[in-house]
From Swiss-Prot:
Residues 33-46 have a biased composition (Low complexity). InterPro entries: Kinesin-like_fam (IPR027640), Kinesin_motor_CS (IPR019821), Kinesin_motor_dom (IPR001752), Kinesin_motor_dom_sf (IPR036961), P-loop_NTPase (IPR027417). It comes from Mus musculus. GO terms for cellular component: centrosome; cytoplasmic vesicle membrane; Golgi apparatus; kinesin complex; microtubule; zonula adherens. The modification Phosphoserine is found at residues 811, 815. Predominant expression in the kidney, testis and ovary. Also expressed in brain, heart, liver, lung and uterus. Residues 100-360, 393-430 form a coiled coil. The keyword Cytoplasm applies. ATP binds at residues 526-533. This is Kinesin-like protein KIFC3. The gene is Kifc3. GO terms for biological process: epithelial cell-cell adhesion; Golgi organization; microtubule-based movement; microtubule-based process; zonula adherens maintenance. Residues 27-79, 771-824 are annotated as: Disordered. Interacts with annexin XIIIB. The keyword Ribonucleoprotein does not apply.
Length: 824
């Protein structure tokens, strides 16, 4: 600090900025201990009176807020000491420092009083009526718990009594209702406990919030007090510096006057003194400038003090508002808590009263039920005595029942033997009747199916319908050709609206004949695009004749599994450009030939034709999926996927009767013929032209065979085509044959439709004679002696019942081969 009285040393005069810098350095840093306050005698300002501040004009100023804080000055000795000083301020703005100090002390006292008020509120909160009421409720809850425990003990005692429950008893229902009410009361008590804990938690949260607001206010007031202290120190240092400068001014003047009366000997010293004097004047001007800056800073401090007062007032108002809100919320919570507790207590009292009343009724009912319990106990003892003698009665009854059951089993066995003999006799009769029915229907049955009109048929006159049906006779079809109606009579005619199942109903009788040991052939005929492949194969969602025939075949085999053992093998081939190819072989392009068996039996077989043994329809589908991909189809003007070859699906069924040893061999040939077409209309060129020529040539050979059979010629030209040669067994009286004629209904295809229907009529008039059944009577009758021929890629027959030449059952010693003719 700069001392209040100091003599200037002219030899080393410091600048005013340096003095100000020294005063700033001596100021204590934050966190360091402040020096002890100077005594009144050492202070630079003498005091004039008690509690008054004297200004430079001699007026007394009473500090604001003194009358309001006189009751609390005894607890603050520093404030009393500050008021006891009377300072003679050198400047017109000097009283503000002490005034600010007084205001700071007043704020501190207010903070202390507020802290005391908060602690008083906390002490009052500890003993409010709400908490007393809460304690009282806790005591009441404890009493209710004791009452509930006592009721539970009584209920357990009642349950422990040996009471026999009775269904529909009014007392048991009341007891269950009481138990339900008791559980509800327990739940409500638990809910009341939860509500009470929530209210206590809310009160604790409000108290914590108030404490947090008080801490923030204390921190703010402490910061403001530190700022006031710092400004006070700077103001005090400034005044001390000004006072010291004023005190040193007279010696300078005296030196100047003394220099004026000196002799000439000291002129040199005079000039030096003048230089120093000029330097001192500059320093005085600088000090005046610094003084102005200090006054400006003092004014800024005054403005800052005003702002701090406004903030303090705002904080006080906020604290008061928060305090009021807290009191209102606490009062509201207290009221809600009291109201909830009263409602819960009243409800608990009412329900507890009802529980006590019901419990008394239950006790009365239990007392009335004791005689009934004694009666039931006596009845139970009597039943127990009867049960002791029950095992003897049960053993006697079991012996008699066993004897009756044994006698009944013997009678059933004898009846079963008789029924088995009758069943076999009826089975043979059914086969004879079925074969007779098929024979009476005709050797080659012909059915026609008309496909619907499609978008590929186009529009205009050529796409009009030229086919009509007889509503009274489903075997007649009418065709309008060149303006003239032509009628045809077949075995069955199906309209475009007929389903795949309707068509298959005409076929399923032949499948049964195949299982019985007959050769069956089903083939589709018609122009390309007439729907032959759809009728034979169909789609996965709506299968055709092939899939349905195989499903029926395996279904019939499964039904006869208890009496017969069957072995089913399949093979597939196609005739493409008069070349026979194996669709299931490893090399589908390999050419195969049709040979006669060298044993002289007249049977035909195809060397190298692949044959697979199957157990279900799924096995067949997996095998034929590969074969279907190998079949030749191409695009023509008449059909996008035109079949360019004749496809044959050959299924061989070999069966053995487990009881008689009778062996049967049936073969099912499913043939999808390639479509007949006119070369000019189908647009065939190159390979397509050569394919069409071969297809038409083979179908023409088929027509020649049908014509020879119809006229009963001695020589039938089966060898003119691979197709007719392969179908020789199916067309020579050794098979049951069905032909499906597919026709198109539109006007532009009437020529092909007319040709197909005429060919169908010629086929229908052919008489082949009754079909023969392939059977062999073995020399054994038990299933354990059955031997199956393995299914492998060896030469297999394609049109006869046996699989290979010389390997059939005819070469087995002691076997008999005969044909069973159906009785007329």
């Amino acid at each position: 600090m700069v001392p209040s009285r100091r003599t200037w040393n002219l030899g080393a005069t410091p600048s005013l900025r340096g003095l100000w810098r020294v005063g700033r350095v001596q100021e204590p840093k934050p966190g360091m201990a402040r020096p002890a306050p100077a005594s009144p005698a050492a202070r630079p300002f003498p005091h004039t009176g008690q509690g008054r501040l004297r200004t430079g004009r001699g007026k007394d100023i009473l500090p604001s807020g003194e009358e309001d804080s006189t009751s609390r000055t005894a607890a603050r000795p520093s404030l009393a000491q500050c008021r006891a000083l009377s300072v003679d301020w050198p400047g017109p703005r000097s009283p503000h420092r002490l005034y600010l100090t007084v205001q700071v002390e007043n704020l501190k006292e207010k903070l202390i009083s507020q802290a005391q008020e908060v602690s008083r509120l906390r002490s009052e909160l500890g003993g409010t009526d709400a908490e007393k009421h809460r304690d009282r409720l806790m005591v009441e809850n404890e009493q209710l718990r004791q009452e509930l425990r006592r009721c539970e003990v009584e209920l357990q005692e009642l349950r422990a009594q040996p009471v026999v429950p009775c269904e529909g008893c009014e007392h048991s229902q009341e007891s269950s209702q009481l138990r339900d009410k008791l559980s509800q009361l327990q739940l409500e008590v638990a809910e009341n406990k939860g509500m009470l804990s929530e209210l206590n938690l809310e009160v604790q949260q409000k108290t914590d919030r108030l404490a947090e607001v008080e801490l923030r206010l204390k921190d703010c007031l402490a910061e403001k007090a530190q700022e006031e202290e710092r400004l006070s120190r700077r103001l005090r240092d400034s005044h001390e510096t000004i006072a010291s400068l004023r005190a040193q001014s007279p010696p300078v003047k005296y030196v100047i006057k003394t220099v004026e009366v000196e002799s000439s000997k000291t002129k040199q010293a005079l000039s030096e003194s003048q230089t120093r004097n000029q330097h001192l004047q500059e320093q005085v001007a600088m000090q005046r400038q610094v003084l102005k800056e200090m006054e400006q800073q003092l004014q800024n401090s005054h403005q800052l003090t005003v702002q701090l007062r406004a903030q303090i007032a705002m904080y006080e108002a906020e604290l008061e508002r928060a305090h009021g809100q807290m009191l209102e919320e606490m009062q509201s919570l207290e009221e809600d808590k009291n109201r909830a507790i009263e409602e819960a207590f009243a409800r608990a009292q009412v329900e507890m009263k009802a529980v006590h009343e019901n419990l008394a009724g239950v006790r009365t009912n239990l007392l009335t039920l004791q005689p009934a319990l004694r009666t039931l106990t006596n009845d139970y003892n009597g039943l127990k005595r009867q049960v002791r003698g029950f095992p003897l009665l049960l053993q006697e009854a079991l012996r008699s029942v066993k004897a009756e059951i044994g006698q009944a089993i013997e009678e059933v066995n004898s009846n079963n033997q008789e029924l088995l003999r009758k069943y076999r006799r009826e089975l043979q009769l059914r086969k004879k009747c079925h074969n007779e029915l098929v024979r009476l229907k005709g050797n080659i049955r012909v059915i026609a199916r008309v496909r619907p009109v499609t978008k590929e048929d186009g529009e205009g006159p050529e796409a009009t319908n030229a086919v009509t049906f007889d509503p009274d006779d489903d075997s007649i079809i009418h065709l309008l050709h060149k303006g003239k109606p032509v009628s045809f009579e077949l075995d069955k005619v199906f309209s475009p609206w007929a389903s795949q199942q309707d068509v298959f109903q005409e076929v399923q009788a032949l499948i049964t004949s195949c299982i019985d040991g007959f050769n069956v052939c089903i083939f589709a005929y018609g122009q390309t695009g007439a729907g032959k492949t759809y009728t034979m194969e169909g789609t996965p969602e709506n299968p055709g004749i092939n899939q349905r025939a195989l499903q029926l075949l395996f279904s019939e085999v499964q039904e006869k599994a208890s009496d017969w053992q069957y072995n089913i093998t399949v093979s597939a081939a196609e005739i493409y450009n008069e070349v026979l190819r194996d669709l299931l072989g490893k090399e589908p392009q390999e050419k195969l030939e049709i040979r006669l068996c060298p044993d002289g039996s007249g049977q035909l077989y195809v060397p190298g034709l692949t044959e697979f043994q199957v157990q279900s329809v799924d096995d067949i589908n997996k095998v034929f999926e590969f074969g279907y991909n190998n079949r030749t189809t191409e695009f023509t003007n008449l059909n996008e996927h035109s079949s360019r070859s004749h496809a044959l699906l050959i299924v061989t069924v070999r069966g053995v009767d487990c009881s008689t040893g009778l062996r049967t061999t049936g073969k099912l040939n499913l043939v999808d013929l390639a479509g007949s077409e006119r070369v000019g209309k189908s647009g065939a060129e190159g390979n397509r032209l050569r394919e069409a020529q071969h297809i038409n040539r083979s179908l023409s050979a088929l027509g020649d065979v049908i014509a020879a059979l119809r006229s009963r010629q001695g020589h039938v030209p089966f060898r003119n085509s691979k197709l007719t040669y392969l179908l020789q067994d199916s067309l020579s009286g050794d098979s049951k044959t069905l032909m499906v004629v597919q026709v198109s209904p539109v006007e532009k295809n009437t020529s092909e439709t007319l040709y197909s229907l005429r060919f169908a009529e010629r086929v229908r008039s052919v008489e082949l004679g009754p079909g023969s059944r392939r059977t062999e009577l073995g020399s054994w009758s038990s299933q354990e002696h059955l031997e199956w021929e393995p299914a492998c890629q060896t030469p297999q027959p394609t049109a006869r019942a046996h699989s290979a030449p010389g390997s059939g059952t005819s070469s087995r010693p002691g076997s008999i081969r005969r044909k069973l003719q159906p009785s007329a």
